[in-house]
Amino acid sequence: MGFKNKLVIGYIGSFVDYEGLDILLEACALLKENHGDAFKLLLVGDGDVMQQLRRTVRFLQLEEHVVFTGRVSHDEVQRYYSLIDIAPLPRKGLRVCELVSPLKPFEAMASGKVLITSSVQALAEIVDYGKTGLVFEKDNANDLAAKLELVLTDTELRKKIGKNANKWVLENHSWDVISKRVTDIYDKILEENK
């Protein structure tokens, strides 16, 4: 895939408008100006905006920087996360994005990747800024490019955030932790209704 000696910025998921992949492409075009040899963008998935994204890649002259895999099975997702260093989630400032939190950020963090989310509430509240990830101003490709550049050029920050993110997910959002919380809630309800 041509990733040797490159940092991999990667997105795994559905290619729909509200995910903001057009914003990610714009940010990568800006990043290319000063760091073109330093990164590749891996886009894993498929969806309604796939052809639009391919046209945008050509328009922004990102053909040498972007790799599309198409849809992959859920069993292959972890293999692709193993290739990724930085996991941006550029969701747009739409109501559905403000309210609904996907599992993607937890998967990326559990894999020890640097999570960079847009400032939509459902994502921003997951991140402890600078510790477990970074947040950029929603719908702002310039700010996303700045955050990408920050972690692209700072190896220590990248390692620290990835390690902290992994630890935080294991301590707060593993299936064992979640099942204990749910069990505790049920136990409390049962106790109150005796």
Name every feature range the model reports, one short phrase each.
Residues 2-28, 42, 182:
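Conserved donor-binding/catalytic core segment of Leloir-type glycosyltransferases
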Residues 12-16, 31, 47, 72:
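Short donor-sugar binding/catalytic loops of nucleotide-sugar-dependent glycosyltransferases
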Residues 89-98:
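Short Ser/Thr-rich beta->loop micro-motif in glycosyltransferases that lines
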Residues 99, 120-130, 134-135:
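Short acidic/histidine- and often glycine-rich active-site loop of Leloir-type glycosyltransferases
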Residues 129-130, 134-141, 150-156:
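Conserved acidic donor-binding segment of nucleotide-sugar-dependent glycosyltransferases
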Residues 143, 150, 157-171, 181-184, ...:
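A short, well-ordered alpha-helix in the C-terminal region of glycosyltransferases
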